[in-house]
Structures are given as C-alpha cells and as structure tokens.
Amino acid sequence: MKCIWLGQAGFLFITHGGTTVMIDPYLSNTLEEEQGPAYHRQVPVQPEFLCTPDVLLITHSHADHMDFGTLDVLFEKVHRPLTVLAAEKAFWAMRQRYGGKAEFVLMTPGTEVTLADMHFTAVSAAHSDPSSIGFVLEADGVFIWHTGDTLFHRSLLAQRPAVVDLLILPINGKGNNMNAVDAARLTRILQPAYVLPMHWELFSTFGCAVQPFADLLAQDPVRVLIPAHYTEFVL
C-alpha cells in the first residue's frame, strides 16, 4: 500500500488495486484566517493533493480534521462515487452541508465497512469531541491503525487487531492528545512493525519536538517513521 502524509492527521492511502482513501485532510489556511497566527501553517499546502478520493474518512469534527476549507474544494471536484465514513458529529455536519454529493456512513466504535479492496473498522478514541473515533484500515495484507486524536485509554487496548503493521498516533500532548511518553507506552503495548507520530508539526503553538518520542523507542524493535510531507512511502 502506498502512503502519503498530508500533514497534521491527514493521510492519503492508495491500494495496489488503485483505491484511494483520504483521512482528515487539512489542506487550507482556514484556521489561521479564522483564528489568527497561532494557526499559521509550518507546512505549505500543495494544491495537487486537493483531489477527490474514493473514500474519505473523518475521525471527528474539529476544524483541523473536518476542514470545510478543504472539503468544499474536494466536493466541488466530485466526478465519481464518493463514500464518506465519519464519526457521529462530523457525519451530521457533513451530510447537512453536502447532501447528496456522497454516500455518508455513520461510524461508531465497532462499525465495519468493506469498500472495493479495503476494509475499515471504527475504534474508540478518548478526545474532547465525545464521538471521536480512530480507524483500522486493512488492504493488500497490511493493517494500519490511525488512532485519530486521542489520549491513552484502556478502551484502545480492547480493540486492537492481532497485527498492526503501521500505527499512526498523536504525540503533541495538547488539546486532549497523548504526549510522547503515553504515545510510546501505547506503541510498546501494541507492538506495531512501524509507528508514525502525527499532529506535532503543523502549528508551532500546538506542536512539539518529535525527537523525544523517537528517543523513547530507540531500544524497541518498532521502527519510527518520520516521512517528508507529500512524499510517498510503501508498506
């Protein structure tokens, strides 16, 4: 599976069969325009990634995950069937705004959906939007767990799949997210092959250094991935 980090919690996944999946894309300057310089992007937008995927995943309703500045552009470009899998609060907001432009599916922990050559499972997240979820994606024999924004919570452990090839999780320790210590602790328990820290680099005010997280796992068998933005890597 091909993976591209779009910044913050946003990713684009492409299966061997060509199915494209985008999760939590924030590809605008909406937050800075609405809330000021604390939300100035450290990573510029690359407009070529403002393309409509086959499947869009939204973990929760916060504006750096359900960004209407990005989503309005994506929905304007819809030229093929689009399915949106969204947490409850985001589901209702998006369905009201975009109506019949997509097939909207309400995802709560435990919900499973198979689309084309990908299987999606919603898992719990402990965040300030109570309807927040994470996603486990399965395709091409690869299991990816994107936790969404979350604190360390025992409910995450109860839902873990038998194998996690790539774990994607926040480390910034702000806004009801795990800090580096708790993120490393969760990583050790889940024992993925790879871990990719997210949600630390886009806004300096709400970010953190990534090296302390990597250092905490330096003696562990897991490989820490810190890919360049908008650059493809393959699992």
Language model features by range: what are they?
Residues 18-57, 61, 69-77, 150-162:
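Pre-active-site segment of Zn-dependent metallo-hydrolases
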Residues 98-113, 158-160, 184, 188-235:
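Binuclear metal-ion centers of metallo-dependent hydrolases, dominated by the metallo-beta-lactamase
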Residues 126-189:
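Active-site-proximal loop/helix segments of hydrolase catalytic cores
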Residues 9, 29-30, 62-66, 91-94, ...:
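Active-site environment of divalent metal-dependent phosphoester hydrolases
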